[in-house]
Amino acid sequence: MSRQMWLDTSALLEAISEYVVRCNGDTFSGLTTGDFNALSNMFTQLSVSSAGYVSDPRVPLQTMSNMFVSFITSTDRCGYMLRKTWFNSDTKPTVSDDFITTYIRPRLQVPMSDTVRQLNNLSLQPSAKPKLYERQNAIMKGLDIPYSEPIEPCKLFRSVAGQTGNIPMMGILATPPAAQQQPFFVAERRRILFGIRSNAAIPAGAYQFVVPAWASVLSVTGAYVYFTNSFFGTTIAGVTATATAADAATTFTVPTDANNLPVQTDSRLSFSLGGGNINLELGVAKTGFCVAIEGEFTILANRSQAYYTLNSITQTPTSIDDFDVSDFLTTFLSQLRACGQYEIFSDAMDQLTNSLITNYMDPPALPAGLAFTSPWFRFSERARTILALQNVDLNIRKLIVRHLWVITSLIAVFGRYYRPN
């Protein structure tokens, strides 16, 4: 079955999941005869046995999840899904598998619009503001690139040897500096702060700030840039935030933009932080200063030329956020741990990933130097490892990441009701 058919089918499963849990998250009281009939019709579209669903609609869904996990953990059964042709194919796989023949039809005979229309006419008990539960939105990620959502810069900060953590810096910055010109670069919600603390005046002139690895993967849209003396609500000691209208302008440049960008204005700026250093031209002498960049931050691949080169991801290794895909896998991971299958499934996913990468190589073989150090559900860290394979064509690396991304989102959807016997 082609990639698009998988996505369409999983979208239908999302609809069923919402249908049966909308009453109260985990309970099913309030389902009427009409609701059960509509639910039965939806199961029929997937060729799912309806046995047991009247007492608990999760029963057939649990059977489907168990079959899917069995399917995905055997690479000789899900091998078609791991081939390059899977993305563009529109045919039923040549491999025979009970999960596909029993539970998934190669064509959806009822359009998704009709399915959604059924959901809009529920007679379920009260939900003043019906909503799709967050954990059921996983398939939406499978339809998009994994770089499209805003991200908090403080989620990306990672401590390394010789570097103080982000939160511990709060206490340090609140302590008066013991020397002149102590540079810093920190992050909080919606803001990145950088500057120099000092116990004496700092003359006007040029100053350079090295962008750390965790920030080099970011771009910002619609940002205000201004002087401040606050970090997580704590006053930063050794900086001056005051200014007058007569002060000479302070500007800065970033590696991806040669224009002088203004500080302390109403201008809304958009730029990326990848590629090197921030060069700041301080217009007036200050006893220390702190510049805040406040806006909507996204991973560089989203809104910059770096999307086409991904150079920001293949720079200095940095553990970036996993685009929250692990949130959608919480239920499945909990069941794996509860039944003692966590390590077994992890090994199966490692084998699946290696088989997928091998299929993209010519001749088929694992690239030299490939080694994963993160668990399979930490998607961004695995993506970084794949994108760092300099001996593999960049377009191939990007396709592998997209391919693995869709499979991970399918696991989040189909594994939700996994309950091994």
Curated annotation (Swiss-Prot):
GO MF terms listed in the record are: host cell surface receptor binding; structural molecule activity
Keywords in alphabetical order: Capsid protein, Host cytoplasm, Host-virus interaction, Outer capsid protein, Virion
Gene3D superfamilies, per this entry?
A: 2.60.120.170
Could you tell me the superkingdom of the organism this chain comes from? Viruses
| Cross-referenced InterPro entries | Capsid_hemagglutn, Phytoreo_P8, Virus_capsid_a-hlx_vir
Annotated Gene Ontology cellular components are: host cell cytoplasm; host cell cytoplasmic vesicle; viral envelope; viral outer capsid
One GO term under biological process is: fusion of virus membrane with host plasma membrane
Keyword flag Membrane: no
Free-text function comment from the UniProt entry: Capsid protein which self-assembles to form the outer icosahedral capsid with a T=13 symmetry, about 70 nm in diameter and consisting of 780 molecules capsid proteins.
**Record's subunit section:** Homotrimer. Homomultimer. Interacts with host peroxisomal glycolate oxidase (GOX). This interaction mediates its relocation to virus factories peripheral to host peroxisomes.
Q: Which family does it belong to?
A: Belongs to the phytoreovirus outer capsid protein P8 family.
What is the name of this protein? Outer capsid protein P8
